[in-house]
From Swiss-Prot:
CDD domains: FTHFS (cd00477). Keywords: ATP-binding, Ligase, Nucleotide-binding, One-carbon metabolism. One of its GO terms (biological process) is tetrahydrofolate interconversion. Pathway: One-carbon metabolism; tetrahydrofolate interconversion. Belongs to the formate--tetrahydrofolate ligase family. GO terms for molecular function: ATP binding; formate-tetrahydrofolate ligase activity. NCBIfam families: PRK13505.1 (NF010030). The keyword Coiled coil does not apply. It catalyses: (6S)-5,6,7,8-tetrahydrofolate + formate + ATP = (6R)-10-formyltetrahydrofolate + ADP + phosphate. ATP binds at T53, P54, A55, G56, E57, G58, K59, T60. This is Formate--tetrahydrofolate ligase. It is an enzyme of class 6 (ligase).
Length: 542
């Protein structure tokens, strides 16, 4: 690794905007972005994927490798990524720093506590929870209805036992007993707010708008009513600054914020993306999970808020994932199976069609695994060419930037100035926005709203939230809301079970299927493989 000062020097960053965290990590003052406003923006490349298998398809690895490969062919590039969540790192998913020869460094530190941003978000979130209950205890001036408190508590850990709890037990000195729950930090609205804020003023305004409860008159109670947004912003004072690290080949990487893509908008901070676009010719950013989740939200929501739009999209696919969506069993996924591959290719086709609806030039990055056969690779390449889409076999895991030159060249040939196309208009009613997404992206035949969802729609209309964008919270395991439906399901009924308003973040969340905001650990979590020796060397994390 290079000292972080050398990476900063590549970007022209002076000491007065750089806050080092040891030798290899630094934060960049978010106010530095203001000084770059007259610079021309570089190209923005959005990396997304087909519907992933449980192991993931290498989207982060591809993003890192592509950025390094662009630099290799003479194009100044920065990669922007989300911060890993500690819960999944210790649980099933593992770390989120790439793999092989295409990683961001120092991987262990990034995957664990990094610069403390997750802690800051959790602290701000839990401060609000504590103040809310304290207000109820000390007279309840706002007349908060304790049966209609929406704000939960949070921690950055997978712990299913905290999904439903009772607080305030032990007598009146401990407050009023009521049901509560914990959510994982990446699911906190504070995380979404931080990722969307462009400066401290914006951050405080968004925090103040967060809805925490209803009062006994059925009126909304916000953070601003509790007058706690200033203290929350104090706890986030450093977390608003993007984190600068490097890839395995010394390419600059900005890693900042970590909202999940299945329950939030699923991409790194707007500050980091805009800063990278000012400092490079090509910014490579990724959106979580498949294109039905992260990419749609990036375009319909994040791009609108940030005032930018991708110049091209990279659709990461693997032979493994396509065979899985064609019916192959995970136990035999590495065996050649052209029939399953043919059937599963329909999943790639749907994601490609969806991306083209946004007027985006697309490059398919076929992330090669050592078990892929030549026949399987040739089939995917041939089918992509039939669809008129550029395709490049990527070997950045094994070879680093050398293995992504073909992909980098394809991307530079594909990029263009794109006229933004959004699937819905902001003044469309929320139910219409959901129907458009369900039919156009998820390929449903019809949409059904539960009674709970219908009541939520009435609340949304009554309080003037009908013109907010929609974030659909659903499974990442299927294009549909049903994780058992692999491949390219269509014509089914898309069921909306509930809706809620994230007024600070500025969107309405539509819940479909079984969505948990607090994950649980598997039978054998990754934590069982982790250790540290007497010299402080960590094993089993990255």
């Amino acid at each position: 690794m290079k000292p972080i000062k050398e990476i900063a020097d590549q970007l022209g960053l002076k000491d007065d905007v750089l806050y080092p965290y040891g030798h290899y990590i630094a934060k960049i003052d978010h106010r530095f972005l203001k000084s770059l406003e007259n610079r021309e923006d570089g190209k923005l490349i959005l990396v997304t994927a087909v519907t992933p298998t449980p192991a993931g398809e290498g989207k982060t690895t591809t993003s890192i490798g592509l950025s390094m490969s662009l630099n290799r062919i003479g194009k100044k590039s920065i990669v922007t990524l989300r911060e890993p969540s500690l819960g999944p790192t210790l649980g099933l998913k593992g770390g989120a720093t790439g793999g092989g020869r295409s990683r961001v460094l120092p991987s262990d530190e990034i995957n664990l506590h990094f610069t403390g941003d997750m802690h800051a978000v959790a602290s701000a979130h839990n401060l609000l929870a504590a103040v809310l209950d304290s207000h109820i205890k000390h007279g309840n001036e706002l007349k908060i209805d304790i049966t209609r408190v929406f704000w939960k508590r949070t921690m950055d850990m997978n712990d299913r036992a905290l999904r439903s709890i009772v607080i305030g037990l032990g007598g009146s000195a401990n407050g009023f007993p009521r049901e509560d729950s914990f959510i994982i930090t990446a699911a906190s609205e504070v995380m979404a707010v931080l990722a969307l804020s462009e400066n401290m003023k914006d951050l405080k305004e968004r925090l103040g708008k967060i809805i925490v409860a209803l009062n006994t008159d059925r009126k909304i109670v916000r953070v601003s009513d509790l007058r706690i947004q200033g203290a929350m912003a104090v706890l986030l004072k450093d977390a608003i600054n993007p984190n600068l690290v490097q890839t395995t080949e010394g390419t600059p990487a900005l890693i900042h914020c970590g909202p999940f893509a299945n329950i939030a908008h699923g991409t790194n901070s707007i500050i980091a993306t805009k800063m990278a676009m000012k400092l490079s010719e090509y910014t490579v950013t990724e959106a979580g999970f498949g294109a039905d989740l992260g990419a749609e939200k990036f375009i319909d929501f994040v791009s609108r808020v940030g005032g930018f739009y991708p110049n091209a999209a990279v659709l990461v696919a693997t032979v493994r994932a396509l065979k899985y969506h064609g019916g192959a069993d995970l136990k035999n996924i590495h065996e050649e199976n052209l029939e399953a591959l043919k059937e599963g290719f329909k999943n790639l086709r749907v994601h490609l069609e969806n991306l083209r609806k946004f007027n985006l030039p697309v490059v398919v990055a076929l992330n090669r695994f050592i078990t892929d056969t030549e026949k399987e690779i040739a089939y995917v390449v041939k089918e992509c060419e039939k669809l008129g889409v550029r395709v490049a076999v990527s070997e950045v895991f094994e070879k680093g930037s050398e293995g992504g030159v073909e992909l980098a060249k394809a991307v530079t040939e594909a990029v263009k100035d794109v006229k933004p196309v959004y699937l819905y208009e902001m003044n469309d009613p929320v139910e219409k926005k959901i129907e458009i997404l369900a039919k156009e992206i998820y390929r449903a035949g019809r949409v059904e709203f539960s009674d709970t969802a219908k009541n939520a729609l009435k609340f949304i209309k009554k309080h003037g939230f009908d013109e907010l964008p929609v974030i659909v919270a659903k499974t990442p395991k299927s294009i549909s809301h049903d994780p058992s439906l692999r491949g390219a399901p269509e014509g089914y009924t898309f069921v909306v079970s509930d809706l809620f308003v994230s007024a600070g973040a500025g969107f309405v969340v539509a819940l479909s299927g079984d969505i948990n905001l607090m994950p649980g650990l598997p039978e054998r979590p990754n934590a069982l493989n982790m250790d540290v020796d007497d010299s402080g060397n960590i094993v089993g994390v990255s």
